[in-house]
Amino acid sequence: RQRQMCIRDSIKTMKADLILKNYEIAKERYAALGVDTDKAIETLEKTPISLHCWQADDVVGFERGEAASGGIQSTGNYPGKARNIDELRQDIEKVNSLLAGTFRLNLHEIYGEFGGKQIDRNEVTVDQFTGWMQWAKEQNMKLDFNSTSFSHPKSGSLSLSNPDPAIREFWIEHTKRCRRIADAMGKFQNDPCIMNIWVHDGSKDITVEKGRYREILKNSLDEILAEELPNMKSCLEAKLFGIGLEAYTVGSHDFYAGYCAKNNVMYTLDTGHYEPTENVSDAVSALLLFVPELMLHVSRPMHWDSDHVTLFDDNTRNLFSELVRANALDRAHIGLDYFDGSINRIGAYIIGVRAAQKSLLQAFLEPLDTLRKYEDEGKLFQRLALLEEEKTLPFGAVYDYFNLKNNIPVGEEYIADIEKYEAEVLAKRV
């Protein structure tokens, strides 16, 4: 047994030596283009990514224990999903152990500690989240927050835009309370809590009074956002459509873009909430001329807002590339938003986070000064040539080194670690 351990340690040392050698070669290659790889790694380590708690349990939460409804749906029934707060926290801690960098945790209101009590959404207070605040502090994580308009008997097809004053006031009160909870979180962690407002409101079929519902939504938002809270930042999220709400969405992109621009509110860009042929990255520089900040919900749509696991694909790379090219990192907050119940959920987290990190790192390693110079001088051939050549630069060696220096599994090593966790922990959740 001791001999086997020595062999494993020897192999590990050899692999580390190879990673270091590859990094030195990559460092030299990038330096020739005026890019500092050490600085890129340092920036990546400091750039926060907000993990979404709902991947761990398929958006069920701890309020009612029911599957998500209201235009969203998690598909798949892979065993091992978190069934309570302790299991969810255990899974997030496992995810953190396999990642390098800076992370936040994004909570929906339905993930509060309700203690088995029936606390309705217009009654929720910070008391249901003090445990989360303390746990996050112990994990060296900051919290973000979301109001939850779906999966409730009063959800229906309209919440904040509902003409029925009783239902509408219920959701207005809920959202006001969520903002106060977010403010308490921000004060506790000495860092603003980003509070996202997304409502599913819409219609399955042809709608006659579109303007009426949008006016009601505007008035509801005006009332909700009137309360000044210094330790949180509100952001508003649009959507194309939802399941059962295909014909009309009250909070469309045009509605929220106009509202956020007029009222100086942060805008949420969800990469799954656009037409499949749209390039979401194009919206970054356009919106930032008119809104103060952006919240990014990075997902992977498959024909619609299917919330597949984020990958290192063109859409993700283009999004982060545009953030860096537009010098917008200090005005953008990065979060993930997908929920795949068909695969190991810990693995889903790691794949998505690593995809976001790789996309960020590749953007940090771009020879921007040279590219900008070519563009300013009208050297379009040179610009296109360098854009093409940078695709095969050895950024993978830089990402491997980033993980190695933080004592995190390199490459595919995390697969075995997750398989072990599944066998020892997840498989026993029956």
What are these model-predicted stretches?
Residues 2-7:
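Short, small-residue-biased leader/transition segments that mark boundaries at the very start
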Residues 182-208:
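Active-site groove signature of glycoside hydrolases
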Residues 206-315:
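Acidic/histidine-rich catalytic cores of soluble enzymes
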Residues 200-202, 239, 338:
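Short linear capping/connector segments at secondary-structure termini
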Residues 10-11, 138-139, 176-192, 218-233, ...:
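Secondary-structure boundary elements
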Residues 14-163, 170, 179-181, 191-193, ...:
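Alpha/beta catalytic barrel-like cores
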